[in-house]
Amino acid sequence: MQVQDDGVNLIPFAKCSRVVSRSPPPRLPSQSLRPMPQRYGDVFWKNLNQRPTPTWLEEQHIPPMLRATGCSQLGLYPPEQLPPPEMLWRRKKRRPCLEGMQQQGLGGVPARVRAVTYHLEDLRRRQSIINELKKAQWGSSGAASEPVVLGEEGCGFPSTNEYPDLEEERATYPQEEDRFLTPGRAQLLWSPWSPLDQEEACASRQLHSLASFSTVTARRNPLHNPWGMELAASEE
């Protein structure tokens, strides 16, 4: 590193690092006198220094017949019992009789068809049990089989005046309604409702009621109606 006459380095941030020397740590006398343990014995180093013998390079002699068939032991699989190569290489044909027995069950009915029929029978049996329980608890109610009639006052909800027995059933059996549902009951609880249709119906009803209210007020008090005021002014 070049130094100027005034003793300032050319590169101000470069400084000469100090030379540090470390002495080896002092060892105990027991460690210095004890010999280092050898991982490998003398036999290993002796065999490593020797040249490889020709027996190492020789391959294990395997008969050509056993090498082709893959059998390592003599007499285990004699070649006379093996099938010919063309029989081993060709594709196996499916047996139609076994396929028909697997796919078809008793009476020549396929297994999938039998499973579906069993499932449908189970569903019918469960539905019949549910209907019997409902008849025992609620009896035969004629209101449950009637369709939903939307009232003009309520937006999509049946009026209580038309179905008074529904309110009695709800008050008497509030918890059993969710457990068992007949198709008629489900029709009462569910209706093809959409928010757009409902909003349009409510808006049309509000406009109709507003128009009727304005006509009634105009007839009663024509001075408050702007059209009535114009007519009154023209007549005067």
UniProtKB/Swiss-Prot annotation:
* Positions of the UniProt region annotated as Interaction with CCNA1 and CCNA1/CDK2 complex: 75-99
Q: Which residues carry this modification: Phosphothreonine?
A: 182
GO cellular component annotations of the record? cytoplasm; nuclear body; nucleoplasm; nucleus
In-chain residues carrying the UniProt-annotated modification Phosphoserine? 23, 191, 194
According to the record, the signal peptide region is: none
UniProt subcellular location:
Nucleus; Cytoplasm
The sequence motif named Nuclear localization signal is recorded at 90-95
Effect on the protein of changing residue 182 to A: Reduced phosphorylation. Phosphorylation is almost abolished
Query: What does its record list under induction?
Result: By serum starvation.
Q: What is the effect of changing residue 191 to A?
A: Strongly reduced phosphorylation. Phosphorylation is almost abolished
Pfam annotation, one family: INCA1
Q: Name the UniProt key words of this record, in alphabetical order.
A: Cytoplasm, Nucleus, Phosphoprotein, Protein kinase inhibitor
**Chief location category:** nucleus
Question: Which InterPro entries does UniProt cross-reference here?
Answer: INCA1
Family from the record: Belongs to the INCA family.
**Subunit and partners:** Interacts with CCNA1. Interacts with CCNA2, CCNB1 and CCNE1. Found in a complex with CCNA1 and CDK2. Interacts with ZNF16; the interaction inhibits INCA1 activity and induces the cell cycle process. Interacts with SPACA9. Interacts with the CCNA1/CDK2 complex. Interacts with ING5, DAZAP2, RNF26, USP15, SPOUT1, DPH7, TRIM26 and RAB5C.
Task performed by this protein = Binds to CDK2-bound cyclins and inhibits the kinase activity of CDK2; binding to cyclins is critical for its function as CDK inhibitor. Inhibits cell growth and cell proliferation and may play a role in cell cycle control. Required for ING5-mediated regulation of S-phase progression, enhancement of Fas-induced apoptosis and inhibition of cell growth.
**Record protein name field:** Protein INCA1
Q: Which organism is it from?
A: Homo sapiens
Which gene is annotated as encoding this protein in its UniProt record? Answer: INCA1
